[in-house]
Amino acid sequence: MDSVHPGGLGGTYGGNPVATAAALAVFEAVEEDGLLEKARRIEQVIREHFEQNADDRIAEVRGRGAMMAIEFVDPATGEPDATLTATVAAAVRAAGVILLTCGTYGNVVRFLPPLTIGEDLLKEGLSEVTKALQSA
């Protein structure tokens, strides 16, 4: 390609040098701060927590990196349990931890902690989920 034909490049922000520099800075920060490794560790901590605190109302712990989720079901039927999910989420919010509920049936709690979260704080938040589940 020797040159771009008229109308061949579009978009107000396409190839913007400032946006390109910002993207490069983000990639450098991800590498320098070890954020990929931190995401992997967050996943490991969440999975280990729910393995150690198994509950038959948790159908699945899923996700990758820092974006994880747990799915709640009625253990007798295997049906999604949106009521339990809402109860757990409300109790955890009352304890000061922000959780998002989601899923087609409203029976999933999603975790998306910042990559910079300290492990102690992450474990404290997960403990609140376990306490809420045990009292539900």
Task: Show where each model-derived region lies.
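Conserved N-terminal phosphate-binding loop of PLP-dependent enzymes in the Aspartate aminotransferase
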Residues: 1-136
